[in-house]
Amino acid sequence: MNRLRSPRLPIATLLGLAAIVVGFLIDPDTLLPTYLATVVTISAIPVGCMAVLMVTYVVRGSWTEGLHIPLTAAALTTPIAAVLFIPVLIALPWIYPWAHESGAEPGPLKAAWLTPGFFILRTALYFALWTVLALWLRGAWADPRRMVRAASAGLILYALSASFAGVDWLESLTPEFHSSIYGLLFLTFQLLAGLSFAFTIVLSTPGAPTFRYGAILLSLLLLWAYNHAMQYIIIWSGNIPEEAAWYLAREAGAWGMALWTLIALQFILPFFAMLSSKLRNGRRSLLRIAALTVGLRFLEACILALPQRQIAGIALLFAVPGTILFAGLLWWAAFAFSLDRVRRSAHDTSPLPDGFDASGTPVASAGSS
C-alpha cells in the first residue's frame, strides 16, 4: 500500500507536534479539549470498524466480504488509539471540571462515578476490551461458526462499553448535563466513523464495485439524524435549565454556525444527493460522501466537546491542525502497516467475492463509475 505512505508524512507529523506545542503555550485550556475531540474521533474509526466488522460477520453477503480487509486492518489499530488517549488521562484536571477541586459539584452519584482514578481505569478497560474483541474477530475470520459466535457476543459487549465511553469522555465534560440516549448517540458516531472510513478505503480504487454501499450509508445517516432529533425533542420538552443550557451554548455565535454546517453537510446534502440512484450507486459520488462523513466526525466531536469552554481563537488555529496532523498521521501510519499485513494473509483466511482480487483490492467492474 505504497499509496497510503509518503515520505512527507514524518515531516507533517513533526509539524503537527510543533503546532501542538505552540497551541499549548498560548492556551492549554483550548489545546487540551481540542486534542480530546481529535483522539475521540480517531479512536472512533478503529472501534467503529470493529463494530461494523461484527455486523458483517452476522449478516454476510457479497457487500460484506469486500469490507472485511479494511475493517479488520482498522480494528487492529485500536491499541494505537489507546496510546494516543494517554495525554487525555494525564491532563484530566485541565479537561474535565470534576477532576479538580474547583470543579463543579456533579452530585453524590456522579461524584462517585467521576473520579480521576476510576475514569482512568474505565478508559483502560474500554480499550482493553476492544483490543481483545478485535483480535478475537481476526482469529475467527476463517471459521463461519466462530465468526457468528464472536460477533454475537462482541456486539453486546461493544454496545455496553461504547455507551459508557461516550458518557465518560464527552457527556461528563458538562457534569450537570444528562441525556438518556447520549450513549446511543456515541454508538452512531463510532459506527458512522467506521463504516464511512471503510467505504472510503474500498471506493478509492478506480473501478471498485459499489454493491449497496449508498443505501447502507444513507440508512445509518438517517439513524444518526433521528437520534440527535430525539435528544433535542426530549430535552426541549423537559425544559430543565441545566440541560437546555447545553444546547444554548451550541446554538450561539460561531458554534451555531458550526452546528448548522454539520446538519447541512451530514444530513441534508447526502440525503438529497442519495435520492438519485446515479449518485447513490456511483463510485466517485459515494467516495466523496463517505470521505466527507469521516471528516465531519471531527466537527461533531468539537461541537460536543468545546462550546462550554473558554476557547482562545489564536490557540485554536494551532490546536486543530496540530492535533489532526500529529495524532491522525500516527494512526494512519499504523493503519497502513496493518492493512499491508491483513492483505498479505487474506487469501489464506477468507474467500473473497467477485470484484476483489486475492489481496482484497477491488478490481474494475463494468458499470462502476
Residue ranges and their predicted role:
Residues 1-49, 331-369:
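N-terminal regions that are enriched for targeting/export leaders
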Residues 2-19, 113-262, 279, 349-361, ...:
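Long, contiguous internal "core" modules enriched in hydrophobic/ aromatic residues
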Residues 5, 180-186, 242-263, 270, ...:
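Membrane-interface transmembrane-helix boundary segments in multi-pass integral membrane proteins
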Residues 37-142:
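Transmembrane-helix bundle segments that line or gate the permeation/cavity pathway
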Residues 44-55, 82-88, 123-135, 188-203, ...:
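Hydrophobic cores of alpha-helical transmembrane segments in multi-pass inner/ER membrane proteins
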Residues 70-83, 148-160, 215-222, 288-297:
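Transmembrane alpha-helical segments of multi-pass membrane proteins
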Residues 174-178, 240, 278-286, 302-319:
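Extracellular/periplasmic helix-loop-helix junctions in multi-pass membrane proteins
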Residues 252-304:
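Extended, compositionally biased non-globular segments
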